[in-house]
Amino acid sequence: MSHQADYKLTLRRDGFTFKQFFVAHDRCAMKVGTDGILLGAWAPVSSATRVLDIGSGSGLLALMLAQRSEPHVRIDAVELDSAASQQAKENSAASPWADRITVYAEDIVSFSAMRTADYSLIISNPPYFPPGIACGSAQREQARYTTLLTHEVLLRCAHQLLMPEGLFCVVLPVQVAEHFIPLAQQHNWHVQQQLRVSEQEDKPAHRVLLALSRQEKECVNFLLAIRDAERCYSTDFQQLTKDFYLFM
């Protein structure tokens, strides 16, 4: 077996295969998961001209939005952790959109200090746990806890980098969103779209996807159950993710 073939097999044991790209995540604290896939499939991208992914991790969201957006759209991904940012660079380089994605290994505060508001869409699957029980590695604590990237800092940096008519999209647990939304409103954000997600159609929502705007408009609310009453993937979930999941 060639070194290249062996390398590809190793990647496929340590990552996630989508229809058009592969995400290796063995060097990332947070692996590919449903939250990120939902956000990447849902975020409104039709009028995007330039996209920013904050806390990119493996580069999943940047890759999903590259697949969904027009060929002229440029995507920047910012990731503080050096191992994760390197893996995001490798994932992007191996994808069909290598010339459209740029990965920056730095924190969002430093990144935003050097740039102007020229992003039409900003997306983030942010840390949302307050500091608590040790995770076993500093890398995982950084990805899970709001110690280094608080929601206030995230909102402030996104506000600084977003074009006036742009959207800032995040995914959060329902309980966290109850505190995040009032904080966002204090920073002059308005919820333009909200998708509440439940594991099953007869269960309460456990995640919320938000599209925030600097413009005040009436909020449009949606519901999505991942599985139906028979515990099969729901039609809505399949429709949303069919361009990505291999067997949808």
UniProtKB/Swiss-Prot annotation:
Q: Which InterPro entries match?
A: DNA_methylase_N6_adenine_CS, SAM-dependent_MTases_sf, Small_mtfrase_dom, tRNA_Adenine-N(6)_MTase, tRNA_adenine-N6_MeTrfase
Keywords annotated in UniProt: Cytoplasm, Methyltransferase, S-adenosyl-L-methionine, Transferase, tRNA processing
Q: Which GO terms describe its molecular function?
A: nucleic acid binding; tRNA (adenine-N6)-methyltransferase activity
Which compartments is it annotated to reside in?
Answer: Cytoplasm
**Superkingdom assignment:** Bacteria
Entry keyword Isomerase = no
Family matches, as Gene3D superfamilies: Vaccinia Virus protein VP39
Q: What top-level class of enzyme does the UniProt entry assign?
A: transferase
Annotated catalysed reactions: adenosine(37) in tRNA1(Val) + S-adenosyl-L-methionine = N(6)-methyladenosine(37) in tRNA1(Val) + S-adenosyl-L-homocysteine + H(+)
Its Enzyme Commission number(s) read 2.1.1.223
- GO cellular component assignments: cytoplasm
What GO terms describe the biological role, i.e. biological process, of this protein?
A: methylation; tRNA processing
For this UniProt entry, what is the primary localization, expressed as one broad class?
A: cytoplasm
The keyword Phosphoprotein is assigned to this record = no
Q: Which HAMAP family match?
A: tRNA_methyltr_YfiC
PANTHER family hit by this protein: TRNA1(VAL) (ADENINE(37)-N6)-METHYLTRANSFERASE
Q: Which family does it belong to?
A: Belongs to the methyltransferase superfamily. tRNA (adenine-N(6)-)-methyltransferase family.
Q: What does this protein do?
A: Specifically methylates the adenine in position 37 of tRNA(1)(Val) (anticodon cmo5UAC).
Q: What is this protein called?
A: tRNA1(Val) (adenine(37)-N6)-methyltransferase
User: Which species is this UniProt entry from?
Assistant: Pectobacterium atrosepticum (strain SCRI 1043 / ATCC BAA-672) (Erwinia carotovora subsp. atroseptica)
